[in-house]
């Protein structure tokens, strides 16, 4: 959290999942919502909601930072899909142990295999 009248960090929420690193990797992680939410693949839905489609959104970001992410995008995507799959696997572990905080945790975390497969497909397609 940033202070109300001070641009300094005053608190960190969910420290367990915090990372400091490549801002382009962070942006790609943020863009996983387009992969995870089928509605965001629908251009008409996005337009109606005032949400840019993924290609336009990435273009806006890359133009703002003056960096071309074309070659790195699939690498960032594979990394972040594996990262999210790992997080979901941790949730499934808490479900198994009876310590999951949310009643729908098992359902929410059920995409581990799908995310891992998507990540591995990107690796095989681009890097092997």
Where are these regions (language model features)?
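Short amphipathic alpha-helical segments and their helix-coil junctions
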Residues: 9-12, 53-69, 114-115, 119
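All-alpha amphipathic helical-bundle segments outside canonical DNA-binding/catalytic cores
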Residues: 68-80
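Conserved NTP-binding catalytic cores of kinases and kinase-like/nucleotidyltransferase enzymes
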Residues: 3-10, 40, 65-69, 105, ...
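Active-site acidic catalytic loop and adjacent metal/ATP-binding pocket
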Residues: 1-25, 29-31
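Regulatory N- and C-terminal appendages and interdomain linkers associated
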Residues: 94-128
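Active-site activation/catalytic loop segments of kinase-like enzymes and analogous catalytic loops
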Residues: 24-65, 79-97
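Short, surface-exposed loop/turn segments at secondary-structure junctions
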Residues: 43-44, 70-72, 98-105
